[in-house]
Amino acid sequence: MPSASTRRRSRALLALTALVAALLAGPGAAQAQTQTPPATPKADCGPGSRPETGLQGRVSPEDHASGRAAQGFTCNTEMVGQYRVPNTIGTVGGFKVERYVDAAGHDCAYYDTTLLYPTNLLDQEGGVNVMDMTDPENPRLTARLVTGAMNTPHESVVVSQKRGLVAAVAGNPGTQAGIIDIYDISKDCRQPELRSSTPMGFLGHESGISPDGNTFYSASPAGQTLVAVDISNPTLPIPISFFRIDSHGLSISNDGRRAYVAGTGSGLRILDTTQVQERAPNAQMSEVSRLTWPTMSIPQNAIPVTIGGRRYVMEIDEFGTLSKVGAARMIDISDEKKPKVVGDMRLEVHQPQNFDAIRNDNGAQNGLQGYAGHYCNVPSRVDPGIVACSFILSGLRVFDVRDPTRPREIAYFNAPVDPRILPAAGIVPSPSNWAMSSPSFVPERGEIWYSDGLSGFYAVRVTNGRWPFRDSGGAGDCLRSATLGFKLHRIEGTRVVRVEATVNGKRRLRQTGRDIRRVTLRNMKRAGRLTVRIVATHNTGSKVVSTRTWNGCKKGKPRVRRIPRPR
C-alpha cells in the first residue's frame, strides 16, 4: 500500500492539475452548442473489428457492466504488442511516445510513465521507459531514464531524428524549474547515454526541437515563457533567446525559421524564429500571426504539414469535457498572416447535444479525463495521409486527412479496461481509459504506437487496408485535395491582368483583374491523372504558361514557359 505521505502528495498534485485546468477552461456548453462543427464521419469497421456499441467514441456504463469494455474496442485495428502494468494503482503511461532507429538498425520506443507524477512510483514505474521494438510483438524494457528532467518530464519528451538525441525539460501540470536532460541514442538507442543535465530551460512543462536537432525550446504556459536553447553541443546547452508567450506544445518548421505554437489561452500563434536559427546576436522571436476559433478549449499541440502542395497546421485542444470540447482541426496557412480553420476532427461524444446522454459514463465528469482530446501526430510532414489522436476515454483515433477540408475517421483502438486496486482513493480516476499520449508511427508496417496512462504502452496495427494507403498510380486510394491553389508565376515589374486555367484540356476558370497573384480551383476530382494548364497574361501583353500534373496524390514538377508580347 502507498504511504500516507505519498497519498497526500498525489492528492495535492491532482488538486493543482484540476486548478490549472479550471483556470484555463473556456466558456460553457451554451455557446458551444451554437458554434460546434459536426462530428467527423464514423469509420466503416471491417472484418475482425470489435466496434463501439453506440455513440462514436463512447464507452457506456452498460459496456463496463457487460464486460465489453474489458475486451476493448477496435475498428480496423489489432494489437501487435504491449508493455502493460496490470491492476495499476497510479499512472503508468503518459504524454509522449517517440520512435528512433539507430545506426545499427535497433528500433526503439521512448515513453514517459508520468501522467500524474509521482503516482507512477506506486507501481514501481519511473521516468521515461526505453523499449527495444526490434520484435514489436514483444516490446522489451531495456532502460529507464530517471535523471532530473526525465524523472518528471510532463509533456516535454522529444527526439531529434537527425542527430539521434532524446531530450526533455522538467515539468509538472503547472510549471517547474527548467532542468534539461539530453541523451545520445544514435549508437545504441536501447541504452541512451546521458550528455548533460543542466538548469538551462528556465521553466518547464512542454517543449519543441528544431528538425536539425540544434535548438531545444523549453515552454511553460503557466510561466509565460519560451526559451530557445542551443544544443549543438549536447554537453553544453546554452540559452540564446527568450520570448514571453503562453506556449503549450510547439513545432518548428523544417527550415527552423518558424515556430507553430499552441497558446493555452491565445490559440495558434506563428512565430518568426529566423534570428534563433541563424544564431544572430541577441536573437529575438516575433509574432507573425495568431488565430482563435469558437470551440477553443486549451490548445495543446500544433504541427505544420503540406498536403497537395498546400501548407496547413494540424492543431488539437485538450480537455473541455461536457463543456466546450476543442478536439482537433486542420488550419490553412498558405497565407501565414491569415490562417484559417478549414476542417475539424471531432467525435459524436464531443458534441453538446450528446452531453446529457454521456454525463454519467465512467470518467466523463473528470475535468482531467473525460471525452475530449489531448495529442495528435502525423507520420510525415509532407502528405501525411493520416492524423492519429489520443482522445482520452475514446482511445486512439485515426483520421484520413488527404482532403484536409473533409477529414474522416478510418480506424480506432480503445484498449481493454483493467480493474483498479484503488478506484476510489482519489489518486487517479475510476476504471476507464486515459489515452493522452502523442503517438508515433511505423508506416512500413502500418503500426501506430501510443500509451494509455492507466495501463501502459501499445503497438497497434491498422488493418483491412485502411492505412498505409495503396498508391495505385492515382486510380486508387492515393487521393489529392479537392481544392487546389496556385501562386502565379510573374514577370518582374509587371502585373497579371488575366488568367485562364484548363483542367485535362477543358477550361475551368477565366479571371480578370488589376493584379492577380493567386487562383484557386475547387471541386476537383481527387483520384486519377490531372493536368492543369494556367495562362497568365501580364499588363505588357506577355504571357506565362505553367503546366502542373498529378497522378493521384503525387505531384509532378511544374513546367513554365514564357511567351513574349506579340510585335
PLM ranges: what are they?
Residues 30-35, 464-567:
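Polybasic, low-complexity, intrinsically disordered segments
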Residues 21-23, 49-52, 536:
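N-terminal start and proteolytic maturation junction detector
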Residues 1, 150-154, 352-355, 420-421, ...:
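Short, surface-exposed linear segments at secondary-structure transitions and domain or protein termini
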Residues 32-468:
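Feature marking well-ordered beta-strand scaffolds used for ligand recognition
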Residues 2-4, 9, 541, 545:
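Intrinsically disordered, low-complexity segments enriched in Ser/Pro/Gly/Ala and basic residues
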Residues 4, 85-87, 509-510, 516:
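Short amphipathic alpha-helical segments with coiled-coil-like heptad repeat character
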Residues 5-32:
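Secretory targeting and sorting signals
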